[in-house]
Amino acid sequence: HSFPTRRSSDLAYGQMRSILMDRDVRSMESALRQSVTTVDGQIEVYDNLSNYITFNETVSGILSYNYSNKYEMYSQIVTTFDPLVSSLKYFHNDINKVTIYINNGIKHDTTLAPLSEIENEAFYNSAVNSTNINWYVDKDKKELISARKMSTLATAGITGIMYINVDYDSI
């Protein structure tokens, strides 16, 4: 006579286990959706910052202008270009580096550098050929990088890459 009781307790246990597993799966799915939404929001912020510099006429004007002497160029870079580009790091602590790499060999602090510095990087070929924002993750170096070709410089005959390195652990 104990057989039906055991069978019903086994059935009840199975149903309870199934209910708890379903609840756990829904909870994990919800947590994952929240995480994805958070990361998407963070990436959107960095994309907007990339757009801000990439399509900034002042930035492209300074980099494409035909200066009469080095001092004039240096003055524009220090007084106007640097503050614009560096402001991204000041307002977003999780940004490690913002650099515009260009093909004219100019180097200034961390904001401006020659393309040759990144020609051997994994992201270079796709970035130099696309004005879309491309994201790259290097798990070994713990780097999260946004890189894209700057169309505003391309129209002036200059190859330029907008590069943002974000703190890997902040995402």
Give the residues covered by each predicted segment:
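N-terminal sensory and localization modules of signal-transduction and trafficking proteins
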Residues: 19, 23-31, 100, 132-136, ...
